[in-house]
């Protein structure tokens, strides 16, 4: 069914830029600002700027890496001054052997296999646990992380991964259900972007057709 479309008009009124091709995993404060200024210096208008994977120290620890971003608040303020709307890349994965992983495993908020063991998914960036977005408590946990980022000045989020194939085939809950739950969480943000969704036609989501 068609959902109430609440997408931010800025996703369509101006270009959407992404730092991935320029910086890949080497996202830094200097690199992001240099990229944004180069956009303007080359006669292009400001628009939505997505800071891609590599801005945090690990997956699930959704805080700016202080080694790469020594003053994230100042960077966000400068990007806004230049006319950009800023989105951050996130994913449902949790890096194993981190404080976040141990906390989420102890509280039962990670995806498990049929035997009840925390599932470790093999995805394009290696091996990670997966946040169980079918649980309201897991959604609340992630929302708190994103609330903190928005309080700093982040405007929205690029919700990557969430593909059905990255969830266990022997889980009680199907991969399609998990993928749809990831999309449902992201839909609450008017500034969202997805690479892939499942069963979310007519939802208030921006999904790209392909990488360019």
Regions found by a protein language model. Name each.
Residues 1-212:
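Catalytic-domain carbohydrate-binding cleft regions of carbohydrate-active enzymes
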């Amino acid at each position: 069914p068609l959902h109430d479309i609440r997408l931010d008009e800025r996703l369509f009124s101006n270009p959407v830029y992404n730092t991935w091709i320029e910086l890949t995993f080497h996202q830094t404060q200097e690199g992001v600002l240099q990229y944004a200024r180069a956009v303007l210096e080359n006669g292009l208008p400001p628009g939505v700027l997505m800071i891609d994977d590599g801005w945090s120290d690990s997956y699930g620890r959704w805080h700016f890496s202080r080694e790469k971003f020594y003053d994230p608040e100042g960077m966000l303020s400068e990007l806004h001054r230049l006319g950009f709307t800023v989105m951050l890349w996130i994913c449902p994965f949790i890096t194993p052997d981190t404080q976040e992983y141990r906390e989420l495993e102890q509280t039962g908020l990670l995806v498990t296999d049929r035997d009840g063991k925390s599932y470790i998914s093999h995805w394009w960036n290696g091996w990670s646990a997966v946040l169980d977005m079918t649980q309201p408590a897991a959604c609340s946990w992630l929302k708190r992380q994103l609330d903190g980022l928005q309080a700093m000045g982040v405007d929205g989020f690029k919700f990557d991964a969430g593909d059905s194939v990255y969830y266990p085939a022997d889980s009680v809950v199907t991969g399609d259900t998990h993928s749809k739950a990831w999309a449902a969480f992201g839909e609450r943000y008017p500034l969202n972007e997805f690479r892939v969704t499942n069963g979310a036609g007519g939802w208030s989501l921006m999904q790209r057709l392909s990488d360019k």
